[in-house]
């Protein structure tokens, strides 16, 4: 990436976003969707946190934890996909607090009536709305973006309709260029949209590593 292109990318991305809330990740939480967008597992690999803007947010995730079975055996428990919505307007840090999940009985109770808490930096509970994401697709591989969009359009307990309208397929992204000074080729428009989104999700250290890598790339 050329230095000039990198500077343009940063000029587009950084001034319009203020990172004010840190979402601390948990190794027992598999984050699937953030604010209507699929979360890349490669992006989160090794990351301890995600930086968020102040305001309403929605997470779709699964709880994954090793539980004990009779006879000193163990198995990996994976919860149904859950939806949680909350507001970080006056919050600088968000932490997961999961209930005790050590055996089959506790896992069954969690499946039937999931409960967990989000805590701020002072370990105070954050108001949340929690629900199970009912999967409507019969496909072998679930598209959680689409399932989340359907959920947000259905006026459920943890629905946030604004994230349903923000969902966009490639054709929508290609036509949404109002924030750009000039209209680049379509493929570049889509690339910029995706790069900006991933850059916003990354924690400061990941962003720093990305910029170091980008500056070392030969001109295209």
From Swiss-Prot:
Reply yes or no: does the keyword Signal apply.
yes
Q: Which cysteines are joined by disulfide bonds?
A: none
Task: Identify one Pfam family in the record.
Answer: DUF2057
- Entry keywords, A to Z: Signal
Signal peptide annotation = 1-20
Residues forming coiled coils: none
Which PANTHER family is this protein grouped with?
UPF0319 PROTEIN YCCT
Q: Give the protein's recorded name.
A: UPF0319 protein YccT
Gene for this chain? yccT
């Amino acid at each position: 990436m050329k230095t000039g292109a990198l500077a343009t990318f940063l000029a587009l991305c950084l001034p319009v976003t203020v990172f004010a809330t840190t979402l601390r990740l948990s190794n027992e939480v598999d984050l699937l969707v953030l604010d209507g967008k699929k979360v890349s597992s490669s992006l989160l690999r090794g990351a301890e946190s995600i930086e968020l803007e102040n305001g309403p947010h929605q997470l779709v995730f699964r709880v994954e934890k090793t539980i004990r079975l009779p006879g000193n055996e163990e198995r990996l428990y994976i919860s149904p996909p859950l939806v949680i919505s909350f507001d970080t307007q006056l919050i600088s840090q968000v932490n997961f607090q999961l209930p005790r999940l050590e055996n089959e009985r506790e896992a069954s109770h969690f499946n039937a009536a999931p409960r967990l808490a989000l805590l701020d930096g002072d370990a105070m509970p954050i108001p949340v709305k929690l629900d199970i994401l009912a999967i409507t697709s019969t496909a072998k591989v679930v598209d959680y973006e689409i399932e989340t969009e359907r959920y947000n359009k259905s006026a459920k307990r943890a629905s946030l309709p604004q994230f349903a309208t923000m969902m966009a397929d490639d054709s929508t992204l290609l036509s949404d260029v109002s924030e750009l000074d000039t209209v680049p080729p379509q493929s570049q428009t889509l690339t910029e949209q995706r790069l900006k989104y991933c850059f916003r999700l990354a924690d400061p250290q990941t962003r720093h590593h990305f910029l170091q890598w980008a500056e070392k790339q030969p001109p295209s």
